[in-house]
Amino acid sequence: EPTWGAGYLGNDLLFHRSPNVAMFLMDPEYAICSHYPADEQWQFLDQPISKEEFEKLVVPSGRIHEVGVELLSHKESIYTIKDADNIDMMFYSPSLKILRGGLKDSSGKELEGRKWTQVIPCGVNKVKLRAQFPTPGKFKLCLYVRDADSNNTWQHGIEYLINAGKGVEKRRGGFPRIGNEFYEMGFYLDHPFENVVSQDGKAYISIENYNSQISGVSGHLELEGKDKKLEKEFNGFTFCWTEKTNKGYQVKVHCPVPGEYSLNIFAKHTEEGRSNTYVCGYYITALAGVRPVPGFPRLSDRFDAWGLELMEPRENIHVPDGRASVKIKTPNEIIFSGHLMKGSQYLDNGLCFTTTSDGVSTVFVHAPETGEFQLNIFGRKPGSKDSEYLSSLVIKADQAASLNPGFPYLKDEFKEWGLELVDHFENILSHESHVTVTLSHPSNISVQLFLFDEHNKQIGYSLPSQTADNKTTISCELPKPGSFKLNIFGTNLSLESTKQTYLGSYKVLYQPK
């Protein structure tokens, strides 16, 4: 043919010059797709094909050959699928990122909404084009190509006509949306390869990445539909949690109510000042909301910057008995404090108590009643007077932790002077009138306790005590049922002043059986 690779015959029946060097030295197996020699010998095939077979062949574009893509299956242009809602096609490709699929209706209009095609690796230099069909009917399945070393526009590669006998269920099916820089940033899908249908509202997305320039990923969940904003309906909740894995990252998702959700995942970069980059996205159909309490802890940027690690829990907390605890691993001597809220109301600071041992700080929490609460955790570096916000969790309590919930209030001097609680790590609920409290302390510290009524009026004088082996046990007789306060005072003999210093207090509830 004299015009081979030089141009094409247009609709105006005129020859249009358009040189294409890829048409020269082409493998006859691919040349036969678009040109049928009248003489079989010029097919240069081991097994020549008939005119009828030629007319069934799909016609790859010149760009397909230029970028080195080859058909390994489905070499005809029309396929009928009776018993399935999907189709898989195999191709040879030197790179995964140079291919993209697309699904159109019979008129050639690209389908909107969910992504119905996916290109996935399937062995060395082999890829699979997978397509799902939203409904029975006729569709055009397309494969697009581009250069490997640039992000130029996608160009037509191949087009198939598919007669689908089945379609996926409503609000089902489809594949993840892949960002423009997905492969350039070194990401690969691990699982799932399709959009998610969740029976319990939970989803787990795993993606591979070994790029040292990526510092992490984050997920953002949105409920599909107008005027449906999770931030408004679930203020204070975080519905995505990311964990580092050996291969990359796992994003855990909680859907709070049944419905259709859109999950978008973004990459964080080590390069300072660079904004987060879109990685991929999924549709999640939740058939139920996560119960009894959805969501995950919210961590501030400072939490990571200080080198802290949230050990447990890594989900919001459900506590049938009203008692919760949070463990944080810290490389430094950070002083943690917890503050409980219900709605917009700040609750008594005495409902939280913090202990530290072997580099792990534990924040204990008492719910004062049934309901949902928000725990805000703050941290203060040694030598600093300012506490900084670090984290928040939601706690759902089925009951109050106690009839007298909360913990003793301890001033900084209590710990700085070396005092420790031996018993009664919580506020005291006593069914008897006699109460004892034991404190350990250095030999240069002496302690005394005083009893006050619910109106903060002192009852009597200092309470009797016994000291042995650097421990002091104080005895107290409660005069009647009701609420009281035990105030702790101490004297530090190593200081010039020997005056008593207020160190802390217990709330006491005397309730006879």
Language-model segment annotations:
Residues T135-D149, P256-E271, G338-H339, E369-G383, ...:
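Short, aromatic- and glycine-rich surface loops/edge beta-strands on solvent-exposed regions
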Residues I81-N86, V124, S198-K202, N246, ...:
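Solvent-exposed, conformationally flexible loop/turn segments
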Residues R114, Q118-L129, E233-V251, G350, ...:
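Aromatic sugar-binding surface patches on proteins
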Residues T3-E112, P176-V197, D301-H318, E416-L429:
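His-Asp-centered catalytic microenvironments across diverse enzyme cores
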Residues A148-F182, H269-A305, K381-E416, N492-K513:
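Short beta-strand elements
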Residues A131-F133, V253-C255, F364-P368, S475-L478:
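Short, flexible loop/turn segments at beta-strand junctions in immunoglobulin-like
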Residues A84-V119, S206-C240, K327-C352, T438-L463:
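Extended low-complexity, serine/threonine- and proline-enriched intrinsically disordered segments
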